[in-house]
A protein has these predicted regions:
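Extended accessory regions or peripheral subdomains of proteins
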Residues: 58-79
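N-terminal, polar/charged subdomain of small-to-medium soluble alpha/beta proteins
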Residues: 1-60
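A generic structural signal for short beta-strands and their flanking turns/coil linkers
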Residues: 29, 47-49, 86-92, 109-113, ...
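Flexible, gly/pro- and Lys/Arg-enriched active-site loops
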Residues: 57, 102-109, 121-127, 131-209
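Residue-level signal for inorganic ion chemistry
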Residues: 17, 67, 93, 183
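Short loop/turn motifs enriched for small/polar and acidic residues
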Residues: 34-38, 96-98, 155-157
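Short, surface-exposed acidic-centric catalytic microdomains
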Residues: 77, 81-122
């Protein structure tokens, strides 16, 4: 790999090598790499400059929804598009189920599903890809809770708990939404919510009471 690629920065060498190993070596989940360059021209009296990084596969659960156009074809195309993201692979896909609209009820029923994927992307990078796929499917963000050709949401990302202006992980109020929990339960019944401490099965049972 290093013989066939040229880099100007040690960071890029380490990141590229880590990515190459994780993608090419079956079963490899995590790598830690340190690269040293002796007598690097950094303008400081140092004999060696080094960079150490750690990279790993992350597991994310994505909720899919559509209630405009040919929803089944749209969701199937979205699954394919997700699987084609660089350094990302879809592992499991739930059955697609028909559910009543949430929030704004004067609109067609939705077709919903969930999938599990492995990715080397960070959450913000993954969100950017989801937004791109939504846009390519014709998604327009006009009415909150309104009709949409495609809706893709990150429900879980490993056991990460994070909130920014752009995203919240785990997804806000996912524990109150049957259209998320039912397909998620099909593929990950024992996945535990990192904040509430309950499994998907337990959250779905609570919702049905």
């Amino acid at each position: 790999y290093l013989k066939s690629h040229t880099f100007k920065l040690l960071e890029k060498v380490a990141e590229g090598l880590a990515e190459e190993m994780l993608v090419r070596i079956a079963g490899l989940q995590k790598v830690q790499i340190e690269i040293k360059k002796p007598w690097a021209p950094v303008g400081l009296p140092l004999k060696t400059v080094s960079v150490e990084i750690e990279r790993e596969w992350h597991t994310a659960y994505i909720a899919l929804g559509s209630n405009m156009g040919d929803s089944r074809s749209i969701l199937e195309a979205a699954v394919q598009a997700l699987d084609e993201i660089k350094n990302t692979k879809v592992e499991k896909v739930s059955t697609f189920i028909t559910t009543p609209p949430y929030g704004v009820t004067d609109q067609p029923d939705f077709l919903n599903g969930c999938l599990k994927l492995s990715t080397l992307l960070y959450p913000e990078e993954l969100l950017k890809e989801l937004n791109r796929i939504e846009k390519e499917a014709g998604r327009e963000r006009i009415i909150h809770w309104g009709p949409r050709t495609l809706d893709l949401d990150i429900i879980f990302y490993d056991d990460l708990v994070a909130e920014t202006d752009a995203l919240c992980i785990p997804h806000v109020e996912m524990h109150k939404r049957a259209f998320v929990l039912e397909p998620l339960h099909e593929i990950a019944p024992y996945k535990r919510h990192p904040v509430y401490g309950k499994t998907v099965r337990e959250m779905l049972e609570d919702l049905r009471k």
